[in-house]
Curated annotation (Swiss-Prot):
GO biological process, one term: regulation of translational initiation
One GO location term (cellular component): cytoplasm
Record organism: Thermus thermophilus
PROSITE patterns: UPF0029 (PS00910)
SUPFAM superfamilies documented for this protein: EF-G C-terminal domain-like, Ribosomal protein S5 domain 2-like
InterPro entries xref list: EFG_III/V, Impact, Impact_N, Impact_N_sf, Ribosomal_Su5_D2-typ_SF, UPF0029_Impact_CS
Family: Belongs to the IMPACT family.
Identification of the protein by name: IMPACT family member in pol 5'region
PANTHER family per record: IMPACT FAMILY MEMBER YIGZ, IMPACT-RELATED
Length: 179
């Protein structure tokens, strides 16, 4: 509570703009006076002041940048308490609440997954499905005249090579890696 106004900050990871917008839609508080937010996903960033004068969205974005975070969305909700805070007070309130929420939030390292695409003839599809199930991997499939194209994301750390080797062995070399 700052000068009788109540501020609540909510933060979450967001791997895409769609995830950020879904989080904002789910956590926005319609009864609040303002729902200001900011998010950063790689080079993409956005912020909104939600009608609050003196641009509180930018201090929220600054809190994200000062914390050195990426792929994150922060929503700050204000319930007006009757006292106007002025330009500096709004910047400190929104930015400070956002910074505190980010400081307290659990953090995880960002991992860039390896994308792999390969094709196999139809007789090998069942074997490929079995290996992917055994390794708890999901793949997008596209059916082509000569077989099936699989596109999957593998965790970083060298998993791609062993997985492709196992698939190649399983299909007796009848696997064509794209790219």
């Amino acid at each position: 509570i700052i000068q009788r106004s109540r501020f609540l900050a909510k933060a979450a990871p967001a791997a895409s703009e769609e995830e950020a917008l879904a989080f904002l839609a789910a956590h926005r508080e319609p009864q609040a006076t303002h729902n200001a937010y900011a998010y950063r996903i790689g080079p993409l960033y956005r912020f909104s002041d939600d009608g609050e004068p003196r641009a509180p969205g930018r201090p929220i974005l600054h809190a994200i940048e000062a914390a050195g975070l990426d792929r994150v969305v922060v929503l700050v909700v204000r319930y007006f308490g009757g006292v106007k805070l002025g330009a500096g007070g709004l910047v400190r309130a929104y930015g400070g609440v956002a910074a505190e929420a980010l400081r307290r939030a659990p953090k995880a390292p960002l991992l860039d997954w390896v994308e792999v695409a390969f094709r196999v003839p139809f007789p090998e599809v069942g074997r490929v499905h079995g290996l992917l199930r055994a390794r708890h991997l999901e793949a997008e499939e596209a059916y082509l005249p000569e077989g099936v194209r699989f596109a999957l994301r593998l965790p970083p750390g060298g998993e791609g090579g062993p997985c492709l080797k196992a698939l190649s062995d399983l299909t007796r070399g009848r696997l064509w890696v794209e790219g």
